[in-house]
């Protein structure tokens, strides 16, 4: 497969601040990824960064079955507060199995399977994503070292193996609620994610405001 190429960019005002959106594309498959960039990220200093895998249900439809939408909002807010950073929107929906298969996996979860068991039952690996493209994107953006917003050790290891210096893991524990606590448990126990649970009551953070609301109301 040919290496991904930087093809276009534009200004993108958001509720979190003004970013530069940079489009990337594989020349052979036309597979697309994007990065949101704020500030000077080519000065050699570690950059606050997030690799965010596409999740239509969480990011756009505000599903409570996962923590994706909440993580997206929190990451953009933290980058904006620092005035400098990169968020790669990694276009591998459903941990790489695609939207329709993710819905099929949801149906199996409705019958009692966890998120890993459902993927395996459909003939997929627990996680089909390839994060190496994100290292190529960081390289093309001039980013050499990152403070990575993640709970996922696989992202850290892939970046390190590809030559991106991960100087710090910045935890991203947000959005826990009664609908996704089992999902988060599974990611921690079966995938090694660094999940810290709220030990009092399950709360979720509203992606569009600064307040927190109880998930059980």
From Swiss-Prot:
Binding annotation for Zn(2+): 55, 66, 68
Class in the EC hierarchy, top level: hydrolase
Required co-factors: Zn(2+)
Pfam families xrefs: GTP_cyclohydro2 (PF00925)
One annotated Gene Ontology cellular component of this protein: cytosol
Catalytic residue positions: 127 (proton acceptor), 129 (nucleophile)
Pathway(s): Cofactor biosynthesis; riboflavin biosynthesis; 5-amino-6-(D-ribitylamino)uracil from GTP: step 1/4
Cofactor mode of binding and number, as noted: Binds 1 zinc ion per subunit.
GO biological process, one term: riboflavin biosynthetic process
GO molecular function: GTP binding; GTP cyclohydrolase II activity; zinc ion binding
EC number: 3.5.4.25
Origin superkingdom: Bacteria
Residues annotated as binding GTP: 50-54, 71, 93-95, 115, 150, 155
Keywords, alphabetical: GTP-binding, Hydrolase, Metal-binding, Nucleotide-binding, Riboflavin biosynthesis, Zinc
Catalytic activity: GTP + 4 H2O = 2,5-diamino-6-hydroxy-4-(5-phosphoribosylamino)-pyrimidine + formate + 2 phosphate + 3 H(+)
Keyword Zinc set for record: yes
Function (record text): Catalyzes the conversion of GTP to 2,5-diamino-6-ribosylamino-4(3H)-pyrimidinone 5'-phosphate (DARP), formate and pyrophosphate.
Family, per entry: Belongs to the GTP cyclohydrolase II family.
Protein name in the entry: GTP cyclohydrolase-2
Species whose genome carries this gene: Actinobacillus succinogenes (strain ATCC 55618 / DSM 22257 / CCUG 43843 / 130Z)
Source lineage: Bacteria, Pseudomonadati, Pseudomonadota, Gammaproteobacteria, Pasteurellales
Gene name of the record: ribA
